[in-house]
UniProtKB/Swiss-Prot annotation:
UniProt protein name: Alcohol dehydrogenase [acceptor]
Group of enzyme by EC: oxidoreductase
Species per Swiss-Prot/TrEMBL record: Ectopseudomonas oleovorans
Annotated SUPFAM superfamilies: FAD-linked reductases, C-terminal domain, FAD/NAD(P)-binding domain
Highest taxon above the source species: Bacteria
Recorded GO MF terms: alkan-1-ol dehydrogenase (acceptor) activity; flavin adenine dinucleotide binding
Binding sites annotated in the UniProt record for FAD: 3-32
Locations listed in the record: Cell inner membrane
Family the UniProt entry places it in: Belongs to the GMC oxidoreductase family.
Amino acid sequence: MYDYIIVGAGSAGCVLANRLSADPSKRVCLLEAGPRDTNPLIHMPLGIALLSNSKKLNWAFQTAPQQNLNGRSLFWPRGKTLGGSSSINAMVYIRGHEDDYHAWEQAAGRYWGWYRALELFKRLECNQRFDKSEHHGVDGELAVSDLKYINPLSKAFVQAGMEANINFNGDFNGEYQDGVGFYQVTQKNGQRWSSARAFLHGVLSRPNLDIITDAHASKILFEDRKAVGVSYIKKNMHHQVKTTSGGEVLLSLGAVGTPHLLMLSGVGAAAELKEHGVSLVHDLPEVGKNLQDHLDITLMCAANSREPIGVALSFIPRGVSGLFSYVFKREGFLTSNVAESGGFVKSSPDRDRPNLQFHFLPTYLKDHGRKIAGGYGYTLHICDLLPKSRGRIGLKSANPLQPPLIDPNYLSDHEDIKTMIAGIKIGRAILQAPSMAKHFKHEVVPGQAVKTDDEIIEDIRRRAETIYHPVGTCRMGKDPASVVDPCLKIRGLANIRVVDASIMPHLVAGNTNAPTIMIAENAAEIIMRNLDVEALEASAEFAREGAELELAMIAVCM
């Protein structure tokens, strides 16, 4: 029996396993549906290009047909191994915008506000470039570094952005977010530094930590409304793990998996559960609702040189050389995360913060890397950072081995369409600026024939895809309709919490891995200190005063 059963060894679950098992008196069980993270493609950064097709390491979900995207069902990759999506993502380290956390504070209290979040980000971070400062930490387990390799086209993109009157930003996690620049990544010595690598690998030998992989969670076990364990399927056999008296079940399966498991276990909207023959444990209608994601559209151009990372016979000598550089020195283009540069911009000058994000790739990327695009080219990803559209996760079946219903409801709010049109226009302006124009051969997609707003809208409906940031399906809040309270306890149930991206009340303006890790760090402290909501607010006030004092001291010393 265990004091804590953590379901899901992703970005959040690995942090929880580390922190909670640090107390040798507590027994911790970590369940993961996928295998151990031993595949070398996980740890070689450019291996990301081959991971989308791996059904072993990737849930490879499909959405429901999207009404506003010409009825298309979209591919939704999610990590299925130790480290979760942090083991298959592009490693971009972005915290989001300060205003995101002010909104969280409005929803869930000061312990989830900006001052507390910044404190945690700094505690977790081991930045390889920046010294310990107002914005960065150097003593944490999460390695954050500059890329060891940057393609000349990625540098040209940043220069072109400045030529298009966008400022250069040397630190997207610093004083301000706006601008173009190079992404810092979760890498160390040219290798991926996933949540598993950062928080789990170093504690595998702890005698009080049991890790069970290839264990597909099928049901949360309740006695009345108290969680007492978890059922899982491993090698077609059903197993159970139970908690001690007073022990807790911690759900960290992500914005898709957590609401799905709750509904399979009888927690959700009563009518939907009844429809699928699931016995009701607790009627909690908001489970699975409030789904938010970053919708993305690309500009793909052919290059007039062989500077990009290409798929061609002429690239073979460079590929062989790059392999040797990586194997023996951990250097070269195989250390690239592909999304080397990018930026944050406003769709219109009157906005008070960026609502568009760019990821520039010095290569062709077609269908999430699942289809090979031959030749030499480059791709600009453009995503709507602050979408207004909301979707849901639901049940398709009561069978735990069947995937859930995923309906992001993309572009259901017309403001999102307007934002993406603006993004295409700004993106084209950057790619037509002198530093990029000299590499330009022709626009492959959408093609130069697509010019008017109506033509751009139709292209968005035909081609837009996820950029992999689903959140919000077990919304945190102070209001009684929220799924979890500010201590992340599920309302109306006992001994069970949610700790992952599903608790975000609002999607952050940026990549979601770092914020999810921060959520887990905050949750671990709440759990270990046994804080209630009232104590949380008191602790947050103390943290705010301490943060303000620290910032004042830094300002004096600078």
